[in-house]
């Protein structure tokens, strides 16, 4: 089983995938790759279900870090939206030992996503002197956790006081849940402020918009992945937004996965794409607020889909938008865009941007 699962999970790392998200160009090879990625992720889910049981499938996503170890019998799940860390195991022998090891490694892991394979059970998590979760979690004495000794003591406390078990009819699942500090989102955002400011100055994109996109896309999870193979903090797709940005910078090919998992490179690429949407694809929209609404929606669903809401002719679409008030443009995009996800996306990003502007 382990060999079969490993083969299914390694393959996504060897193919180049993209999605209609963040781009409109139809590409047959892209469609084949995307379908293949979906199939492999379906196999992943199916095999996890075989190991863990019905309704126990947990997979890494844009706002969920999930790492399996111990022949897929132990997993660490960080929900960056809810602010919870759940460590679980179905190990039949010494489950507490498996949990303890996973708790310590999760609390002390670094922030280099390129060094961790979320699609295998390889225990490639290294203990960092600067843990990614430092300050986002405190122990039972209210102290942040930087060193292995404190992490070990906290793990012992959790196993003694918060260990839970449940049966799903197939397995006994042992678990421990840790709540992150209330302002965990702000603490993660703070890690990337320098990179955001640099990209903002470089491309002329408002810092508040970059931060709002990052919050909406990944909740500032540098390990963010998606079933459409969007990667990193700003969920950049290699063969659409990534390729467009590289072309505009005179580079050939597409950014690698490791490149997009590097926070600075991801923020730079995502911000460059926002600038392209603003200055090139949607540059015919005169009012800056109306154009911002269009750019936000296009970051999710593509510039072409935004313009087609108003007219199938791109020039005519921009002309129509230019006769409308920004409020009417917002109302139209949040009610008439064909994608429900894109309609919600504009609302979420616009709301988040307002909060960052007030800071």
Swiss-Prot record:
Cellular component GO terms held in the UniProt record: cell outer membrane
Covalently attached lipid (N-palmitoyl cysteine), positions: 17
Broad class of where this protein is predominantly found: membrane
Catalysed reaction, written as an equation: Exolytic cleavage of the (1->4)-beta-glycosidic linkage between N-acetylmuramic acid (MurNAc) and N-acetylglucosamine (GlcNAc) residues in peptidoglycan, from either the reducing or the non-reducing ends of the peptidoglycan chains, with concomitant formation of a 1,6-anhydrobond in the MurNAc residue
Broad EC category: lyase
One GO molecular-function entry: hydrolase activity, acting on glycosyl bonds
One Pfam entry name: Mltc_N
Intrachain disulfide bonds: none
Membrane topology: Lipid-anchor
EC number: 4.2.2.n1
GO biological-process terms attached to the record: cell wall macromolecule catabolic process; cell wall organization; peptidoglycan metabolic process
Sites of S-diacylglycerol cysteine lipidation: 17
InterPro entries per the UniProt record, alphabetical: Lysozyme-like_dom_sf, Murein_transglycosylaseC, Murein_transglycosylaseC_N, Transglyc_AS, Transglycosylase_SLT_dom_1
Cellular localisation: Cell outer membrane
Coiled coil (UniProt feature): none
Domain of life from the UniProt record: Bacteria
Cleavable signal peptide: 1-16
The entry's keywords: Cell outer membrane, Cell wall biogenesis/degradation, Lipoprotein, Lyase, Membrane, Palmitate, Signal
Protein family according to the UniProt entry: Belongs to the transglycosylase Slt family.
Described purpose of this protein according to its UniProt entry: Murein-degrading enzyme. May play a role in recycling of muropeptides during cell elongation and/or cell division.
Identification of the protein by name: Membrane-bound lytic murein transglycosylase C
Organism: Escherichia coli (strain SE11)
């Amino acid at each position: 089983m382990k060999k079969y699962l490993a083969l299914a999970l390694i393959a996504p790392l060897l193919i180049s995938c993209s999605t209609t998200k963040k781009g409109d160009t139809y590409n047959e090879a892209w469609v084949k790759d995307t379908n293949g990625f979906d199939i492999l992720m379906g196999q992943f889910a199916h095999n996890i279900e075989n190991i863990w049981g019905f309704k126990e499938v947990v997979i890494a996503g844009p706002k969920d870090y999930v790492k399996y170890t111990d022949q897929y019998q132990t997993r660490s799940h960080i929900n960056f939206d809810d602010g919870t860390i759940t460590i679980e195991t179905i190990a039949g022998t010494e489950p507490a030992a498996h949990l303890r090891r996973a708790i310590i490694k999760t609390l002390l892991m670094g922030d280099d996503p390129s060094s961790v394979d979320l699609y295998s059970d390889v225990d490639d998590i290294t203990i960092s002197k600067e843990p990614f979760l430092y300050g986002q979690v405190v122990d039972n004495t209210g102290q942040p956790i930087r060193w292995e000794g404190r992490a070990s003591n906290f793990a012992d406390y959790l196993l003694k006081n918060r260990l839970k078990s449940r049966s799903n009819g197939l397995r006994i699942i042992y678990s421990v849940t840790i709540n992150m500090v209330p302002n965990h989102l702000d603490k993660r955002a703070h890690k990337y402020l320098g990179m955001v400011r640099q990209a903002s100055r470089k491309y002329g994109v408002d810092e508040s918009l970059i931060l709002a996109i990052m919050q909406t896309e990944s909740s500032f999870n540098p390990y963010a992945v998606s079933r459409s193979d969007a990667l990193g903090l700003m969920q950049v797709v290699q063969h659409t937004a990534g390729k467009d940005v590289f072309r505009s910078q005179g580079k050939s090919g597409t950014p690698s996965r490791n490149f997009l998992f590097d926070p600075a490179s991801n923020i730079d690429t995502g911000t460059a794409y926002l600038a392209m949407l603003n200055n090139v694809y949607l540059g015919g929209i005169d009012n800056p607020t109306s154009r911002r609404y269009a750019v936000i929606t296009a970051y999710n669903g593509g510039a072409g889909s935004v313009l087609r809401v108003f007219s199938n002719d791109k020039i005519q679409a921009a002309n129509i938008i230019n006769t409308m008030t920004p409020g009417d443009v917002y109302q139209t995009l949040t009610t008439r865009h064909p994608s429900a996800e894109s309609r919600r996306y504009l609302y979420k990003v616009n709301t988040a941007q307002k909060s960052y502007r007030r800071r």
